[in-house]
């Protein structure tokens, strides 16, 4: 299915690109999220007439994400307390929701879908550097300190 991208999508394209994607991906994700429109003649004409407005909106979102990234990078270590055993192993784990809530409580709004934990949830007491993806091009690093209660 041919779609016109209204936003930069990783591994797919950027604003204004006409790309061929699977119909389920377009119908269930790209179009409902407002990230793409079907590539009909009417939509192509509509996109060309609104191109400057959409590019300005994308640039504004990128600038806002960069500002949030600077705020996240400027944060001191975020402390999360959890029950732990004698050897420092946690009862349970610290996941993306816990980290996002702690960063938000520290003053920078972050959703759980923006927190990246490539090695999985944190299961031990200690200091960690957690990657936060605020935009498809903007990453920040948050320092997280997990302590025993």
Curated annotation (Swiss-Prot):
GO cellular component term of the entry, any: ribonucleoprotein complex
Keyword RNA-binding listed: yes
One Pfam family named in its UniProt record: Ribosomal_L9_N
GO MF annotation list: rRNA binding; structural constituent of ribosome
Record's keyword annotation contains rRNA-binding: yes
Gene3D superfamilies tied to this protein: Ribosomal protein L9, C-terminal domain, Ribosomal protein L9, N-terminal domain
Matching InterPro entries: Ribosomal_bL9 (IPR000244), Ribosomal_bL9/RNase_H1_N (IPR009027), Ribosomal_bL9_bac/chp (IPR020594), Ribosomal_bL9_C (IPR020069), Ribosomal_bL9_C_sf (IPR036791), Ribosomal_bL9_N (IPR020070), Ribosomal_bL9_N_sf (IPR036935)
Cystine connections: none
Keywords: Ribonucleoprotein, Ribosomal protein, RNA-binding, rRNA-binding
Superkingdom of origin organism: Bacteria
GO BP terms: translation
SUPFAM superfamilies per UniProt: L9 N-domain-like, Ribosomal protein L9 C-domain
Coiled-coil spans in chain: none
Described function: Binds to the 23S rRNA.
Protein family membership: Belongs to the bacterial ribosomal protein bL9 family.
Name used for this protein in its record: Large ribosomal subunit protein bL9
Organism the protein comes from: Vibrio cholerae serotype O1 (strain ATCC 39541 / Classical Ogawa 395 / O395)
Upper classification of the organism: Bacteria, Pseudomonadati, Pseudomonadota, Gammaproteobacteria, Vibrionales
Designated gene of the protein: rplI
